[in-house]
Regions:
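Hydrophobic transmembrane alpha-helices of multi-pass small-molecule transport proteins
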Residues: 125-141
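Small-residue-mediated transmembrane helix hinge/kink sites in multi-pass secondary transporters
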Residues: 24, 86, 114-115
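Transmembrane-helix signature of multi-pass solute transporters
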Residues: 45-49, 109-113, 135-139
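C-terminal transmembrane-helix exit sites in multi-pass transporters
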Residues: 106-125
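Residue-level hotspots within transmembrane alpha-helices of multi-pass secondary transporters
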Residues: 21, 83, 108-112
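Non-cytosolic membrane-interface motifs at loop->transmembrane helix junctions
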Residues: 67, 97-100
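Membrane-interface interhelical linkers
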Residues: 1-16, 28-33, 38-72, 76, ...
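Residue-level recognition of transmembrane alpha-helices
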Residues: 39-40, 99-103, 126, 130
Length: 143
């Protein structure tokens, strides 16, 4: 369990770096929605290759029955996220700061959602960390 805990976060970090690097590197002449289409097509193909590697013998029909509304709603969130970053980078946001601004703002919005919807608890240390993150965001925004 401990391996999965750290591996999952490491994978998230590595994939996030690759994600932002590739978003910034997409040709400025490429149509954003066509680019997203082929991004999802490559992601779908990678997923189809990985399913039998990670879950040999998986019955797709049974697995599909376990899905709920959140899987499909996530599709809308992913399109918005990816289109938003693609357009932000085209509008001139720096790779080094664009994701930081976004992630701090997302964290501020997710805190009350985590507490109210998922009954997560926040300690004083968490609130201090949030204050420091917001302070850093303000300092980064100063010219």
């Amino acid at each position: 369990m401990k391996f999965l805990y750290f591996f999952a976060m490491g994978l998230t970090v590595v994939a996030n770096v690759a994600y932002h690097f590739c978003q910034k590197a997409i040709s400025p002449n490429a149509n954003p929605l066509v680019s997203l289409f082929f991004t999802y097509l490559s992601g779908m193909l990678i997923t189809l290759v990985c399913i039998p590697l990670f879950y040999p013998g998986l019955q797709i029909g049974s697995a599909v029955k376990e899905l709920n509304w959140a899987t499909f709603a996530l599709g809308f969130g992913i399109v918005g996220l990816e289109l938003g970053f693609l357009l932000a980078y085209r509008a001139g946001w720096n790779l080094s700061l664009g994701a930081l601004y976004s992630n701090v703002m997302v964290t501020v919005l997710l805190l009350p959602i985590g507490v109210l919807v998922f009954k997560e608890t926040l300690t004083g240390r968490h609130w201090v960390g949030l204050a420091l993150a917001l302070s850093g965001l303000i300092l980064l925004g100063k010219q």
